[in-house]
Amino acid sequence: MGTAELKIILEFSAGAELLFGNIKRRQLALDGTKKWNIANLLKWMHANILTERPELFLQGDTVRPGILVLINDTDWELLGELDYELQPNDNVLFISTLHGG
Amino acid sequence: MIDSEALENERTKLKREIAELRAALNRKEQCLRDLETTISEATGDEDDVHPDTNGGVCHTQLSNDDIARYSRQLILPDFGVQGQLRLKNSSVLIVGMGGLGCPAAQYLAAAGCGKLGLIDYDEVERSNFHRQILHSEARCGMSKAESARIALLELNQHCEIRCHTRLLNSRNAMHIIRTYDVVLDCSDNVATRYLLNDACVMLRKPLVSGSALKTDGQLTVYCYGNGPCYRCIYPVPPPPEAVTNCGDGGVLGAVTGTIGAMQALEAIKVIVGLGDVLAGRLLIFDGSSCLFRNIRIRSKRPNCHVCSAQPLITELIDYELFCGMHATDKDNPLQLLASEERLDVEEYRNKVQQQPHLLIDVRQPAEFEICQLPDAVNVPLAEVLDDSYLKRFSKQLEDTQLPIILLCRRGNDSQIAVQHVRNRFPKHSIRDIIGGLHAWTHKVDPSFPIY
């Protein structure tokens, strides 16, 4: 591993983007010299890009109920949730659940 | 001078009476249809009809009218006569006759679904028409279920339609759902979604769940095959402040139409046994960039409270309590402030409006553009909460004698704004207007628009 950057894509859908400056897709270059799991990523997001009411995104160390987390289009619950270790070019998608009709 | 208020009252009264008469006519027509069905069964008019195990009837042949009407789907190789007969013998319950329920019901009735149940406690109003496409201006004030029935029977008189005009709750849900094969969740609130899920798990009914807001939509099928239920995916309800309804967030009709039409498609696939049903997957529709995304969601949760082998929930609970939210999308007035921190509209008009004051309207710019009070300045709630408004009003805010009045559409967000602003300016008089602009229309100026 000679690269010093871990490049991943963050996406937000169904209103979750409103908490992150209304940007639906971001390319991140994280510090590649250390290991990143979803728990660290959430802390990084809180410190760097979460612009509106954090309680609408986070609850304790994890996302609040009603937000789904998908890693490469697969539910994070199938992949180890907070412990999933991010790989280069991973796509992490946060979806707010909708209830209207 | 003509008493315009009396005329207006007379008009409202007449409209209501006409709506009631239409509903009564509708019920009579349904009675007649039921009676004719009973007569034709008793006299054995239809030799393709056999009693089924539920005491209903089971069609084993298509009529010539069926063949002509459904010819374009009958010739589909995977659908065919057997598919059409399954639809004809099926019953689907649609919960919510709004933006999702209208198109879903329309496609199911058109496709030849034998029996539709329609649930909605609410009445038709003007703000429904842009997306709830079965209702009409003439049926304003009528029950949504009754209104939808009229439109659906015009489309297909062979469809048997049953209306349930009460709010679905823990006491009536099992009884109503039991008689249907498939349930469509076209509701607009979290409590009803948990209620429908639990009842469908207990009764083993596939639940086709759709939702929409703004330009986004979501769709999946719960309780089908080995797929998960709603609680497997969402074991804990979201915090109420994180839930936005269509009345507050807005929604485009073509978006609910897209999701509603797909709910009908999934119901038809479940009934006919066609294709791959959207279970264990979630369809996400982003209408603003026209992106459909199909994601794999978890399978059944082994310790799910309702659908696992050892469920903790074995009968329906109080879902409004469980969610901390009402089972409707109607206004839930907040009560965050003491009465001395609030102002009613008359007091604002009679006293405050005549004096120097700072009136801050905290709605979104798109809402402010629709209508606004004279002298109001627009500072969206988010800009109040992140203090970016301070710079703009630094001069005025130096004067502790200048009353600050906060205003919004219905008097909820304005209370949140007062709580925030008074912490920073404890010496100022900071109040909000009770009931917001809706109260202004109702009590001060009836010509002020309502949305």
UniProtKB/Swiss-Prot annotation, chain A:
Write down which residues bear the modification named 1-thioglycine. Answer: G101
Modification comment: C-terminal thiocarboxylation occurs in 2 steps, it is first acyl-adenylated (-COAMP) via the hesA/moeB/thiF part of the MOCS3 homolog, then thiocarboxylated (-COSH) via the rhodanese domain of the MOCS3 homolog.
Is the tRNA processing keyword given for this protein?
Answer: yes
Q: Where is this cross-link: Glycyl lysine isopeptide (Gly-Lys) (interchain with K-? in acceptor proteins)?
A: G101
**Cross-referenced InterPro entries, in alphabetical order?**
Beta-grasp_dom_sf, Mopterin_synth/thiamin_S_b, Urm1
Keyword set includes Cytoplasm:
yes
Complexes and interactors:
Interacts with cer.
Would you tell me the protein name for this molecule? Answer: Ubiquitin-related modifier 1 homolog
Q: Could you tell me which species this protein originates from?
A: Drosophila ananassae (Fruit fly)
Lineage of source species: Eukaryota, Metazoa, Ecdysozoa, Arthropoda, Hexapoda
Swiss-Prot record, chain B:
Specify the Rhodanese domain's residue ranges. Answer: 353-449
Its needed co-factors are: Zn(2+)
Q: Report the EC code(s) recorded for this entry.
A: 2.7.7.80, 2.8.1.11
Which species does this protein come from? Drosophila ananassae
**Gene name?**
Uba4
Q: Which GO terms describe its cellular component?
A: cytosol
Q: What is this protein called?
A: Adenylyltransferase and sulfurtransferase MOCS3
InterPro entries named among the record's database cross-references: MOCS3/Uba4, Rhodanese-like_dom, Rhodanese-like_dom_sf, ThiF/MoeB/HesA, ThiF_NAD_FAD-bd, Ubiquitin-activating_enz
Q: How is the cofactor bound?
A: Binds 1 zinc ion per subunit.
Predominant subcellular localization, coarse grouping:
cytoplasm
Residues annotated as carrying Phosphothreonine in the record are T60
List, alphabetically, the HAMAP family matched. Answer: MOCS3_Uba4
Cite a single GO MF annotation.
URM1 activating enzyme activity
Which residues bind Zn(2+) per the record?
Answer: C229, C232, C304, C307
Annotated residues that bind ATP are located at G99, D120, S127, N128, F129, H130, R131, K144, D188, N189
Biological processes annotated in GO: Mo-molybdopterin cofactor biosynthetic process; protein urmylation; tRNA wobble position uridine thiolation
